[in-house]
Amino acid sequence: MTKSLFRQSFLFDSLDLDHPMVAQTVRTEQGVTLKLHQRGVLEVIPAQTDAATKNMVISCGIHGDETAPMELLDKWIDDIVSGFQPVAERCLFIMAHPQATVRHVRFIEQNLNRLFDDKPHTPSTELAIADNLKVLLRQFFANTDEHSRWHLDLHCAIRGSKHYSFAVSPKARHPVRSRSLMQFIEQAHIEAVMLSNAPSSTFSWYSAEHYAAQALTLELGQVARLGENLLDRLLAFDLAMRDLISRHKPEHLPRKSVMYRVSRTIVRLHDDFDFRFSDDVENFTAFMHGEVFGHDGDKPLMAKNEGEAIVFPNRKVAIGQRAALMVCKVNTRYEDDQLVYD
């Protein structure tokens, strides 16, 4: 069955830019339908669907050098094709940017994960990819119930982190922080969750905002080359994903995640901008209240809350771009089956 759909595998066929990936459909002995739509895009349809069937987008490779999720996704697809991995949910697997992955670069012209807002952008390789991904989402979510829509966008962090894995929950106009989504996070042993406080330009935000999908950006370890990822540290995530796809009850115990709210976004305003810490500072490094950690022009950058921590710091961003997120730990609860905080 594998040879009839892929010459090597979903991942490595997608990366072989010298050979076309022809759209085709096959069915496994278990009755699962696999539709290869285009390079890097595979739809998987279970043999039977019902009112509880999820419509899940599982994407990776938005940044070309974040390869751990690609290796995991490739294994899931291999096991679906062979029949080893049961399928109970309709899935759209996406490997977004093969050209960048082949070069082992984050992007070619501009950051793909900043192109999903509704603002005009300069034409580029990445803008064409973003436009194509928007079309794929529209087609995949067409004629589906909002409650059935999920989107897990899988990444790796550029830098080390106090939390090896963490999730970013987008802020959308729809209720997209369901109890079932957060239960999956705990089952996957994702160490922390960041609750965004404003709209953004990411792929997962786009799904949440435009399709009311239960959406997350998941940061899984640190950037490495294909074959050099520490996948054993993502075992619980691997198992939780397999249980999610098959709708099986997990056999391993969940683990509580540390919850953070985004307290503010630091946007670079001046040429004279810098942080006081080194480039290898870890995500979620915390500061004391009032501690100065950088400057923007004449203005010092300081912690406004005790224990306020920094995530995704980048001193090299252009003026007007996000230079960091600041986060604080928060207690959460559920209202109407949605995660909230005071």
Curated annotation (Swiss-Prot):
Q: Which UniProt keywords apply?
A: Arginine metabolism, Hydrolase, Metal-binding, Zinc
Name the EC number(s): 3.5.1.96
State the name under which the record lists this protein: Succinylglutamate desuccinylase
Cofactor: bound how, per the entry note? Answer: Binds 1 zinc ion per subunit.
A GO MF annotation of the entry reads: zinc ion binding
Upper taxonomic lineage: Bacteria, Pseudomonadati, Pseudomonadota, Gammaproteobacteria, Vibrionales
- Any one biological process term the GO annotation gives: arginine catabolic process to glutamate
Q: Which gene encodes it?
A: astE
InterPro entries reported for this sequence: AspA/AstE_fam (IPR050178), AstE_AspA_cat (IPR055438), Aste_AspA_hybrid_dom (IPR007036), SuccinylGlu_desuccinylase (IPR016681)
The family annotation for this protein states: Belongs to the AspA/AstE family. Succinylglutamate desuccinylase subfamily.
- Residues annotated for Zn(2+) binding in this entry: H63, E66, H155
Function according to Swiss-Prot or TrEMBL: Transforms N(2)-succinylglutamate into succinate and glutamate.
Native organism is Vibrio cholerae serotype O1 (strain ATCC 39315 / El Tor Inaba N16961)
Q: In which pathway is this protein known to take part? A: Amino-acid degradation; L-arginine degradation via AST pathway; L-glutamate and succinate from L-arginine: step 5/5
Name the domain of life.
Bacteria
* Reaction equation(s) it catalyzes: N-succinyl-L-glutamate + H2O = L-glutamate + succinate
Can you tell me which residues form the catalytic site? E219
Cofactor requirements of the protein:
Zn(2+)
